[in-house]
Design a protein with these regions (language model features):
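Short, surface-exposed connector motifs at secondary-structure boundaries
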Residues: 51, 147-148, 208-211, 421-427, ...
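Conserved acidic/glycine
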Residues: 1-31, 151-152, 156-157, 178, ...
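A glycine-rich helix N-cap at a beta->alpha junction
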Residues: 78-89, 170-182, 205-209, 446-461, ...
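Short glycine-enriched loops at secondary-structure junctions
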Residues: 89-95, 375-381, 388, 406-409, ...
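A short, small-residue-rich loop immediately preceding and capping a beta-strand
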Residues: 20, 56-57, 108-111, 141-159, ...
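Thiamine diphosphate
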Residues: 91-103, 127, 131-134, 140-145, ...
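Flexible, small-/acidic-enriched active-site or ligand-binding loops
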Residues: 470-473
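Cofactor-binding active-site loop characterized by glycine-rich and histidine/acidic residues
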Residues: 30-172, 385-386, 418, 525
């Protein structure tokens, strides 16, 4: 029976990829046995309740092998993955896109495809489960109690981010993380002996992982036994499973020819004969469906029913926790953060926005027990520390400060995993110039609709002495170009509070907070509520103004000072604070016209960053005071003066407008 089911997985993959004339059959054919063993013997999921909070998670880190996952979901009974959807693999509007997409297809726990990010994201799942278990489980009531399983390939383990995350997972002793390594000695360009020769198991042992080897990737009992041993090891586990890529293909198995191209009609026919598969394309024997129903769907439904009874009993036994747990199960925050939670700030108060951010995040932390995060070894520079808590580790699982180490990319993927798991609000910080290291993870935050908060400090050339390696220039423009990411560069402590409030109440959009090291003064015109519009008027000296200054962050203070100087000379000036171009661009035409009237063409945008994205606001008649070269090393006042960010120079720029 098991051999029939394994071959059903293989041929669903082969046939769908042939029909699409696009895809990666090799991993489907080689990894089918380990995936079958995992789904039918270990994985606890309920296809009728795909979002069950306590389900085991499965991450196909080798996302190019998506037909392996779609075949498993179809056979397991997930309604989203019908046979029609299998036949529509990689087609417009289908539930079976080229790489798995979270939120698009039920049963997909994470978007994967960029190699290395899946296994790294899985680390976040495991850490989320551990925190929620420590927070809410009570004796006899293990409400949060599940494993995170991964299938990865050689390519995943070549990527640096997987090494970052594996080092972190070993340090944290995330013992409910089990990785099956599809070790087939082949990559797209040829054999791994030409590019990847170290002992992966030795490396993972050094990280503090349990490791094992299954020498025959078709030995279902050996795979099952290895997983059982891994679960009892007390460590994260990597099981190397030696497989043959394209298993069963007489002329292509074991070669890179089967990695990323359809088998084609002739080789498919030969493979059918070699594996004894006497069925037509997309024909699956009923006994295969029965096998998956009994060993995946029915087993999972039974586990779900047992768990729902446990939750009901838990609510009676622990009513003080019941409301919070119920909210988490329903996909809500256990406590609502409101604007009233933040203290009212006086005009003239001076503080670096990184410090304002720490004050704001501690307001959130005091209100929301499932709010946690950290920094890539810069907590005392990024100001990301929750003051009431210590560091989280295996013996202090309830603490909410996470020390990610100098692992920016892994930090982003781990945050994504924690957000994907559900039940948590998470954040992570680093210097803004190092946002490039984490950007690929930020992109997957945005693509998956995860409300992760990224805290980026030391936001401009005002860093000064550290020089151009640490002074962001192009970074704001780059992040603003990303779909579904809200970038906030607040002008002062008041706007920083508002940005944090919007970040932790966002449902499907991540947030990047771009913050200063230097002090900024709270302007009289800044407004907590208006930050939600992305831009608003902070200063105006005449109703019939004919000049608009648009500024963000630290340059709002500069723009207001310049406007007052211009006003003293008889000019009629409006200053607009634009903490988020992304949010402002989503406002209706009437609001945009209210803030930036089309009739007023004398406009100057002021920002210590690349100028390119400001021309859509100032037009051909306006000007941009920005930076389109790299920074320099000197005391900050000298650097700012040399780059023209002074009241005198800004006044001159305005006066030079036609």
């Amino acid at each position: 029976m098991s051999n029939l089911s394994v071959n059903a997985i293989r041929f669903l993959g082969i046939d769908a990829i042939n029909k699409a004339n696009s895809g990666h059959p090799g991993v489907v054919m080689g990894a089918a046995p380990m995936a079958y063993s995992l789904f039918t013997k270990q994985l606890r999921i309920n296809p009728a309740q795909p979002n069950w909070i306590n389900r085991d998670r499965f991450i196909l880190s080798a996302g190019h092998g998506s037909m392996l996952l779609y075949a498993l979901l179809h056979l397991s009974g997930f309604e989203d993955v019908s046979m029609d959807e299998i036949k529509s693999f990689r087609q417009w509007g289908s539930k079976t896109p080229g790489h798995p997409e979270f939120g698009h297809t039920a049963g997909i726990d994470a978007t994967t495809g960029p190699l290395g990010q899946g296994i790294s994201t899985a680390t976040g799942f495991a850490q989320a489960e551990r925190f929620l278990a420590a927070k809410y489980n009570r004796e006899g009531y293990n409400i949060f109690d599940h494993y995170t399983y991964v299938i990865c390939g050689d390519g995943d383990l070549m990527e640096g981010v997987s090494s970052e995350a594996a080092s972190y997972a070993g340090l944290q002793k995330l013992d409910k993380l089990v990785v099956l390594y599809d070790s087939n000695d082949i990559n797209l360009d040829g054999e791994t002996k030409d590019s990847f020769t170290e002992s992966v198991r030795d490396r993972y042992n050094a990280y503090g992982w349990h490791t094992d080897l299954v020498e025959d990737g078709t030995d279902l009992e050996a795979i099952h036994a290895a997983i059982e041993t891994a679960k009892a090891s007390g460590k994260p586990s990597l099981i190397e499973v030696k497989t043959v890529i394209g298993y069963g293909s007489p002329n292509k198995q074991g070669t890179n020819a089967v990695h990323g191209a359809p088998l084609g009609a002739d080789e498919t026919a030969a493979t059918r004969q070699a594996l004894g598969w006497d069925y037509e394309p997309f024909e699956i024997p009923e006994q295969v469906y029965a096998d998956f129903k009994e060993n995946v769907a029915d087993r999972g439904a039974s586990a779900y029913q047992t768990w729902t009874k446990l939750v009901a009993d838990y609510k009676e036994a622990h009513p003080e926790l019941a409301a919070e747990v119920e909210a988490i199960i329903d996909g809500r925050d256990p406590v609502e953060v409101t604007p009233a939670d933040f203290p009212v700030l006086e005009n003239g108060f001076s503080q670096a926005t990184r410090n304002s951010s720490q004050d704001a995040l501690n307001v959130v932390a005091a209100k929301l027990p499932t709010f946690l995060g950290g920094s890539a070894d810069l907590a005392h520079s990024n100001m990301t520390y929750i003051k009431t808590d210590g560091l989280q580790d295996d013996t202090n699982r309830l603490n909410r400060n996470i020390q990610f180490g100098v692992r920016e990319f892994a930090m982003g993927t781990i945050l994504n995993g924690m957000a994907l798991h559900g039940g948590l609000r998470v954040y992570g910080g680093t210097f803004f110039v190092f946002s490039d290291y984490v950007k690929a993870a930020v992109r997957l935050s945005a693509l998956q609709g995860l409300p992760v908060t990224y805290v980026f400090t030391h936001d401009s050339i005002a860093v000064g002495e550290d020089g151009p390696t640490h002074e962001p220039v192009e970074h704001l423009a780059g992040l603003r170009a990303m779909p579904n990411l809200n970038v906030f560069r607040p002008a002062d402590a008041r706007e920083t509070q508002a940005a944090w409030y919007l970040a932790v109440t966002s449902e499907k959009t991540p947030t990047a907070l771009v913050l200063t090291r230097q002090n900024l003064t709270v302007e009289e015109g800044t407004d907590f509520d208006k930050v939600a519009k992305g831009a608003y008027v902070v200063y105006e000296n005449a109703a019939d103004f004919d000049t608009i200054l648009i500024a963000t962050g630290s340059e709002v203070n500069l723009a207001v000072s310049a406007a007052k100087e211009l006003a003293s000379q008889g000019a009629k000036v409006r200053v607009v604070s634009m903490p988020s171009t992304d949010v402002f661009d989503k406002q209706d035409a009437a609001y945009k016209e209210e803030i930036l009237p089309n009739a007023v063409r004398r406009r100057v945008a002021v920002e210590m960053g690349a100028s390119q994205n400001w021309y859509k606001y100032v037009g051909l008649d306006g000007a941009v005071l920005g930076i389109d070269t790299f920074g320099a090393s000197a005391p900050a006042p000298k650097v700012l003066a040399e780059y023209g960010f002074t009241v005198e120079n800004l006044v001159k720029v305005v006066q030079n407008l036609k």
